[in-house]
Swiss-Prot record:
Changing residue 60 to A: In T-haplotype. It is found in: Cytoplasm, Cytoskeleton; Cytoplasmic granule; Membrane. This is Dynein light chain Tctex-type protein 2. GO terms for cellular component: cytoplasmic dynein complex; cytosol; membrane; microtubule; sperm flagellum. The keyword rRNA processing does not apply. GO terms for biological process: microtubule-based movement. The lineage of its organism: Eukaryota, Metazoa, Chordata, Craniata, Vertebrata. CDD domains: DLC-like_TCTEX1D3. It comes from Mus musculus. Residues 11-20 have a biased composition (Polar residues). May be an accessory component of axonemal dynein and cytoplasmic dynein 1. Candidate for involvement in male sterility. It is a peripheral membrane protein. Changing residue 153 to G: In T-haplotype. It comes from the Eukaryota.
């Protein structure tokens, strides 16, 4: 029996190659010479004669396209967010108001074990007074320190990371013979 394929055996047992018809290799579009030829062949195959065009119905297709595009169009509004406050925090006004609150609230107070409770009341009063200035989009941190005078030294330090253009802080101090009250107000602008 004879095998079919490229390599066929002869009756004597020797193999020989059967003649394979060689096809021409397709030109590659990456070769500069054959690229123009490929384009010409593709363009030749893509030309068609238009024999008949159906007339449009009552509603024109062009009108439908216009309606569809107008439905996609959205109104554009300007951005509503602000990058800066309407009214900048004015430290000198807040400082005078806090000084007045401390002076009025602490004129007859002696230092005792109720000082922590008094610190909370002062902080709430200062926060309410600062909010009356109506600084839009500002957040406030109020810290009131009640320190008894016993001949000691004290260092108070604060650190922060903020925007130096809009954020600020205020300190107010009220001092008597038996205690010192330090009120700190931090005003932070939130965009």
């Amino acid at each position: 029996m004879e095998r079919r394929g490229r390599m066929a055996k002869t009756p004597t047992g020797q193999t020989h190659q059967s003649p394979v018809s060689k096809r021409e290799r397709k030109p590659s579009m990456f070769e500069k010479e054959s690229y123009a030829q490929i384009l010409r062949e593709r363009l030749r195959e893509s030309f068609h004669d238009v024999q008949y065009v159906e007339p449009p119905f009552d509603d024109s297709i062009a009108d439908v396209g216009k309606e569809w595009k107008s439905a996609l169009a959205k109104l554009k509004f300007a951005n509503s967010y602000r990058m800066e406050p309407l009214k900048k925090f004015q430290a000198h006004l807040v400082e005078t108001k806090i000084q007045q609150i401390l002076k009025d609230s602490l004129k007859d107070v002696k230092y005792d074990d109720k000082a922590p409770h008094l610190s909370l009341e002062l902080a709430d009063g200062i926060l309410a007074a600062v909010k009356e200035f109506a600084y839009h989009r500002y957040k406030f941190i109020i810290q009131v320190l009640f320190i008894q005078k016993t001949g000691q030294a004290i260092n108070i330090a604060s650190r922060w990371i903020w925007d130096v253009a809009w954020d600020n802080w205020v300190e107010a101090k009220h001092e008597t013979e038996s205690y010192v009250v330090l009120a700190l107000v931090f005003a932070l602008y939130c965009e």
